[in-house]
Amino acid sequence: MKKLLWVCIFLMVQCALSQSSDIVRLEYTTLPKKESSRSISRFRFLANLPIKLNDENYIITGAEYGIIDFANDSIYEFDDKELEKLRIVDLNLGYAHILNEKWTFIGLLTPRLASNFINGVQKEDFNLNYSVLAIKADMKKEKPTRLILGLSYNNATGFDVPLPIVSYYKKFHPNWSYMVGVPRMEFKYHLKQHHTFKAALLLDGYFVNVQNDIALPDNDLGSGLSLSVVVGAFGYQYNINKNISFYCLAGHTLSQRGLLRDEERKSVYSLYDDGNVYFKTGFKIGIF
């Protein structure tokens, strides 16, 4: 059973902007409306399941569904109805090999559909992402540690080469722990069994195909939408038990860019680039 749980660690690594150790997660994120931008809300549901082949080898299966809502109070000089509701659907298929008590190797393939789906599913909606990871963990010693090294390719990032995934975790005191790396850093205070407080710095973002290209000023066409943010935040987590919890996060975007892109992924229109408050809340069944 312990090996089965360990395989779940980072089985949802979908791209260089996403890490998750969750079996189930239900999450809501919002960036409220400002004078220079519309409000954005995102709902996510994911589920993952490892299938045991033998004591050392597992198949990983999973799926994620996300809905992105833009408020319908248009502030732009073009018809932006195509952007009101966007959807992302991921399927995960992976393989995990437990080399020994400390080392585990994982490979993950993630087909993705990301679009407004105005005209059903089109080939431009499809992307194929993959990740490979090496995980070294020593969670039984007095000061537990975990190191994750890997590469992840995501067509939506616009880079033609895999991007690095680096994460190091250490619980250096019964009440204190930290995690440093890309794409997330955290510093946690564990108050008794049920309450955890944290400060976090994280990356977030996505790319979605826009069917029915949007006609823009200067005769440009918007064929896709990308959002990337760097967020500094404080959070609270209520732990029902070791693996089940409710959580919330509140902060501010330190960097934020929303862009319309043409068929070659070149930026053709800036939707917003100023900072905004950032709220996230959810429920998860995880490993740690």
Place the predicted regions along the sequence by residue.
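Transmembrane beta-barrel domains of bacterial outer-membrane proteins
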Residues: 21-119
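Membrane-embedded beta-strand positions of outer-membrane beta-barrel proteins
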Residues: 24-26, 61-63, 107-109, 147-149, ...
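Transmembrane beta-strands of outer-membrane beta-barrel pores
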Residues: 28-34, 65-71, 97, 111-117, ...
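Residue-level signature of outer-membrane beta-barrel architecture
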Residues: 49-53, 97, 134-138, 170, ...
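Repeated loop/turn-to-beta-strand initiation elements of outer-membrane beta-barrel proteins
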Residues: 55-60, 102-105, 139-147, 175-178, ...
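Outer-membrane beta-barrel translocator/channel fold
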Residues: 63-89, 183-266, 272, 277-279
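Outer-membrane beta-barrel "beta-signal"
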Residues: 166-169, 273-288
